[in-house]
C-alpha cells in the first residue's frame, strides 16, 4: 500500500507529546472544532473510511487569535480539492464558526506545495504541521524551525523537474526531522519510508 494509515498517524502524533489537544485522525466527516476556548488540531482525509481514504490534510484552531489553519501539503484551492477529491469543508468550518461568540474566525490556508505529486507522504507532512502548530501556534505556517524544514513551491512549478527536486529534498528533510524528534518514526522508519516513498504514486495522480 502507499501512504500512512489512520493508526500510524495517531501513533506518530501521540509520540509528539503535544501540549494542545489533538482531536485525532478523521475521514471527511470531521465535525470541526466545537470547543471555542481550547487550541486543537486534527488530521483529516479527503475520502471516507469506507473507501480507504485518499489524501491527508491538517487543520488547527487557535481560539485566542480566532484563526483556523488548513495545511494541505499540495496547497490545493477549494476548486482543485473538489475536482480531485470531491470534497468540501464548508460544513465543519460553519460548525466551528457557530461556536464563536460572534460566529466569526479567520481561515488561514497553505497556498504552495511542499510535497511532490509523486509522493505518498501527505500524512507525514500533515503531522509535521501539527508539531509546528504545537510549538509555534502564532506562526505555524512559516517562520519557525519546524515548518521551515520544508520549502514551498508554486503550483505552476510543481511538475517541473527543477522544482520537483526541491520537493524531493523537502521529503528527505522531513524524514530527518522525524528521525531526530519522534520515537515512533524511529521505531518504524523502514516501513514508513517505504509506504510514503517518492515515486510511489502514479504519474498524474
UniProtKB/Swiss-Prot annotation:
Name a GO CC annotation attached to this entry: host cell nucleus
Annotated GO MF terms: cysteine-type endopeptidase activity; DNA binding
Q: Which Pfam families match?
A: Peptidase_C5
Arranged from A to Z, the UniProt key words for this protein are:
Autocatalytic cleavage, Disulfide bond, DNA-binding, Host nucleus, Hydrolase, Late protein, Protease, Thiol protease, Virion
Reactions that this protein is recorded to catalyse: Cleaves proteins of the adenovirus and its host cell at two consensus sites: -Yaa-Xaa-Gly-Gly-|-Xaa- and -Yaa-Xaa-Gly-Xaa-|-Gly- (in which Yaa is Met, Ile or Leu, and Xaa is any amino acid)
The compartments listed are:
Virion; Host nucleus
Instruction: Offer one example of a GO biological process linked to this entry.
Output: proteolysis
Catalytic center residues: 55, 72, 122
Q: Per its UniProt record, what InterPro entries does this chain match?
A: Papain-like_cys_pep_sf, Peptidase_C5
> Per the record, where is site Cleavage?
52-53
Activity control mechanisms: Requires DNA and protease cofactor for maximal activation. Inside nascent virions, becomes partially activated by binding to the viral DNA, allowing it to cleave the cofactor that binds to the protease and fully activates it. Actin, like the viral protease cofactor, seems to act as a cofactor in the cleavage of cytokeratin 18 and of actin itself.
User: What's the domain of life for this entry?
Assistant: Viruses
Q: Which HAMAP family match?
A: ADV_PRO
What do we know about how this protein assembles, alone or with others? Interacts with protease cofactor pVI-C; this interaction is necessary for protease activation.
What more does the entry say? All late proteins expressed from the major late promoter are produced by alternative splicing and alternative polyadenylation of the same gene giving rise to non-overlapping ORFs. A leader sequence is present in the N-terminus of all these mRNAs and is recognized by the viral shutoff protein to provide expression although conventional translation via ribosome scanning from the cap has been shut off in the host cell.
Q: Into which family does the record put it?
A: Belongs to the peptidase C5 family.
What is the stated purpose of this protein?
Cleaves viral precursor proteins (pTP, pIIIa, pVI, pVII, pVIII, and pX) inside newly assembled particles giving rise to mature virions. Protease complexed to its cofactor slides along the viral DNA to specifically locate and cleave the viral precursors. Mature virions have a weakened organization compared to the unmature virions, thereby facilitating subsequent uncoating. Without maturation, the particle lacks infectivity and is unable to uncoat. Late in adenovirus infection, in the cytoplasm, may participate in the cytoskeleton destruction. Cleaves host cell cytoskeletal keratins K7 and K18.
Q: What is this protein called?
A: Protease
Q: Which organism is it from?
A: Avian adenovirus 8 (strain ATCC A-2A) (FAdV-8)
The protein's gene is named L3
Amino acid at each position: 500500500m502507499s501512504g500512512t494509515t489512520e493508526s500510524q498517524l495517531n501513533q506518530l502524533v501521540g509520540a509528539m507529546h503535544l501540549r494542545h489537544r489533538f482531536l485525532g485522525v478523521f475521514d471527511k466527516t470531521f465535525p470541526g472544532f466545537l470547543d471555542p476556548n481550547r487550541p486543537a488540531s486534527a488530521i483529516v482525509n479527503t475520502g471516507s473510511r469506507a473507501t480507504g481514504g485518499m489524501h491527508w490534510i491538517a487543520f488547527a484552531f487557535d481560539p485566542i487569535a480566532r484563526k483556523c489553519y488548513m495545511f494541505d501539503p499540495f496547497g490545493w484551492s477549494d476548486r482543485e480539492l473538489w475536482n480531485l477529491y470531491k470534497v468540501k469543508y464548508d460544513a465543519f468550518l460553519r460548525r466551528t464558526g457557530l461556536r464563536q461568540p460572534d460566529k466569526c474566525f479567520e481561515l488561514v490556508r497553505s497556498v504552495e506545495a511542499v510535497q511532490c505529486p509523486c509522493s505518498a507522504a501527505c500524512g507525514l507532512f500533515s503531522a509535521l504541521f501539527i508539531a509546528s502548530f504545537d510549538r509555534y501556534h502564532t506562526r505555524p505556517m512559516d517562520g519557525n524551525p519546524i515548518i521551515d524544514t520544508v520549502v514551498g513551491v508554486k503550483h505552476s512549478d510543481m511538475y517541473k523537474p527543477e522544482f520537483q527536486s526541491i520537493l524531493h529534498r523537502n521529503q528527505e528533510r522531513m524524514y530527518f526531522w522525524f528521525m531526530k524528534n519522534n520515537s515512533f518514526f524511529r521505531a518504524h522508519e523502514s516501513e514508513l519510508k517505504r509506504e510514503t516513498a517518492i515515486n510511489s504514486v502514479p504519474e498524474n495522480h
